[in-house]
C-alpha cells in the first residue's frame, strides 16, 4: 500500500466478507425451510430470514464499493484521503445500521414494505453515510 489512508479499505472489505458469510447462512436457512426442513422456524421465521438475507446483500455491496473507492482513489489521485476520520466514522455508522437492522428484523421492528424493510431512522443514517462518502471522495479528488 502506497498510502496510509488505504488501510481504511481493509475495514470495509472485512465487514463485507462477514456480511457475505451471514447472507449465505440466511440463504441456507431459507433453502432448508423451502424444502420442509424448517427446524429454526420458531426462532427465525421465513419472512425474517428473507428480509435479513436481502438487506445483508445491499449492505455488503455498499460496504465493498466504499472500500474499493477508499483503496483506489488515493492511488489514482496520488494523495491521501482528505478526511480519514470521516471514513472511520462512516464505517462504524454503516456497521451500526447493519447490526441494528438485523437485530430489529428478529424482533419484528421494520417498516413492512417489500425490500425496504429497515426502519426509517436507519434509512436516514444510510443517506447521511452515503453523503459523507461522496463528500470525502469529492474533496480528495
How would you label these PLM feature ranges?
Residues 1-8:
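Cytosolic juxtamembrane amphipathic/interface segments immediately preceding
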Residues 3, 31-34, 116:
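Short secondary-structure boundary micro-motifs
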Residues 10-35, 46-77, 84-108, 121-140:
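Hydrophobic cores of alpha-helical transmembrane segments in multi-pass integral membrane proteins
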Residues 40-44:
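Solvent-exposed, non-transmembrane regions of integral membrane proteins
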Residues 109-119:
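Inter-helical loop and helix-membrane interface segments of multi-pass membrane transporters/permeases
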Amino acid at each position: 500500500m502506497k498510502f496510509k489512508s488505504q488501510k481504511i479499505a481493509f475495514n470495509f472489505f472485512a465487514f463485507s466478507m462477514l456480511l457475505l458469510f451471514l447472507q449465505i447462512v440466511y440463504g441456507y436457512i431459507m433453502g432448508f425451510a423451502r424444502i420442509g426442513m424448517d427446524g429454526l422456524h420458531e426462532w427465525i421465521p421465513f419472512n425474517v430470514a428473507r428480509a435479513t438475507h436481502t438487506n445483508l446483500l445491499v449492505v455488503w455491496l455498499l460496504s465493498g464499493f466504499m472500500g474499493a473507492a477508499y483503496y483506489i482513489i488515493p492511488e489514482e489521485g496520488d494523495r491521501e484521503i482528505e478526511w480519514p476520520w470521516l471514513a472511520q466514522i462512516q464505517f462504524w455508522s454503516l456497521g451500526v445500521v447493519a447490526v441494528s437492522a438485523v437485530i430489529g428484523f428478529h424482533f419484528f421492528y421494520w417498516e413492512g414494505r417489500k425490500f425496504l424493510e429497515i426502519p426509517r431512522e436507519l434509512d436516514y443514517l444510510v443517506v447521511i453515510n452515503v453523503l459523507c462518502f461522496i463528500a470525502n471522495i469529492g474533496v480528495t479528488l
